[in-house]
A protein has these predicted regions:
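Hydrophobic membrane-targeting and insertion signals
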Residues: 1-93, 97, 102, 120, ...
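Amphipathic alpha-helical binding modules
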Residues: 98-145
Length: 146
């Protein structure tokens, strides 16, 4: 069984994971529809306008903590010999809440009002948005931790 935490220690792999995380996020944002989709797209447009490359840098900065939070779920998935997509989707709320512990803590320490405002706009639906991303997220985890 592969460990996400161990995989990220490889300096050749880490940038690939970061790039794939950014692609996954872009795809999820592009898929959003309706009023909430407009809000999500607007929030991310604001974030990207504040500092180009911020999303990639943020993923790189958070990746070790994200891996630590997700790795127990991945290990359970592997122990159960479960289909990663099925496992991650069925555990999406627990995984989302584990990941949000990281970002909630970070946003409390942020000095950037625009980022705080954008996060506050998205946070009420964050568990749902992360849950929507679980199939792609499971594919990403499988790609690197298998």
């Amino acid at each position: 069984m592969g460990s996400l935490v161990e995989v990220l220690k490889d300096p050749a792999v880490r940038p690939l994971v970061v790039a794939d995380c950014e692609k996954m996020l872009d795809a999820e944002i592009a898929d959003k529809k309706g009023l909430s989709g407009i809000a999500v797209k607007g929030a991310f447009k604001t974030l990207k306008a504040i500092k180009p490359g911020m999303i990639r840098h943020t993923f790189d900065d958070l990746l070790d903590e994200l891996a630590e939070k997700v790795d127990p779920f991945w290990q359970d998935c592997q122990t159960q010999k479960a289909n990663p997509r099925t496992f991650f989707v069925s555990n999406s709320s627990a995984i989302a809440n584990a990941l949000l512990e990281i970002t909630d803590g970070r946003i409390k320490r942020s000095k950037f009002k625009n980022i705080i405002r954008a996060y506050s706009t998205l946070r009420p639906k964050a568990v749902q948005y992360i849950g929507d991303a679980m199939p792609r997220f499971a594919d990403l985890v499988s790609k690197y931790a298998s």
